[in-house]
């Protein structure tokens, strides 16, 4: 299975859903990270440094990573043209699952813009008549999920036990040395994961939000209860 994880900036994917991706890599799935900027507007770290930090983190995750140029950090625009560019990458990689930042407004506008672009791109990727995408065969994404970078969204639709991956996740986040030396971002993420874990009776957990209803063949797939306490 191919899984495409998309972030607006270097470190979004790593802080938002890296443990989930590590689990998938260990299951033998192919993971590609697609980053829409190099953090050009940030106060810490140059674009070159931040790109290298992402590449280092991707190696720990076991994923490939690529960067797209959308005029830089803080200049990501919600336009059909930008969604089409992302859709072309979807046709190229052919993911069955896509994960992206939640489109709900939060503290950085690029996160919500990225989520909206990816949502549209998933639709565009399956449209056969789009001349802008004619160079690649039509592809239908199976499911789109959104991850949360901050901790103030509503309760996630899917909660995944990541208790056995905390040290690996911390190592991935520490790859972004330029971003974690002055603020306790890692502790913030771990605290959020700990609180989410309490809701399912595990030490740590990560959440995903659905874009569409999740299709099942049988409810026995849901036999694992979150009520372990």
Where would I find each of the regions flagged by the language model?
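Metal-dependent de-N-acetylase/amidase catalytic core
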Residues: 1-4, 78-229
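Active-site rim/loop-helix segments in enzyme catalytic domains that contact anionic ligands
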Residues: 1-93, 221
């Amino acid at each position: 299975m191919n899984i495409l994880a998309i972030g607006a900036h270097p470190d979004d994917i790593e802080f938002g859903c890296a443990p989930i991706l590590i689990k998938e890599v260990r299951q033998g799935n192919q993971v590609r990270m697609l980053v829409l900027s190099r953090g050009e507007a940030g106060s810490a770290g140059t674009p070159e440094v931040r790109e290298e930090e992402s590449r280092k983190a991707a190696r720990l995750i076991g994923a490939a990573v690529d960067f797209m140029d959308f005029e830089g950090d803080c200049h990501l625009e919600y336009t059909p043209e930008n969604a089409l560019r992302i859709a072309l990458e979807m046709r190229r990689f052919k993911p069955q699952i896509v994960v992206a930042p939640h489109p709900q407004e939060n503290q950085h506008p690029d996160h919500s813009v990225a989520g909206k672009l990816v949502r549209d791109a998933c639709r565009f990727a399956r449209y056969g008549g789009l001349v802008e995408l004619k160079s690649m065969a039509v592809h239908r994404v199976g499911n789109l999920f959104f991850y949360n970078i901050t901790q103030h969204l509503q309760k996630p639709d899917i909660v995944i036990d990541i208790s056995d991956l905390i040290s690996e996740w911390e190592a991935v986040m520490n790859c972004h040395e330029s971003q974690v030396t002055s603020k306790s971002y890692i502790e913030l993420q771990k605290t959020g994961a700990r609180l989410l874990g309490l809701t399912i009776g595990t030490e740590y957990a990560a959440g995903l939000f659905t874009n569409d209803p999740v299709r099942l063949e049988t409810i026995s797939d849901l036999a694992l209860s979150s009520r372990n306490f």
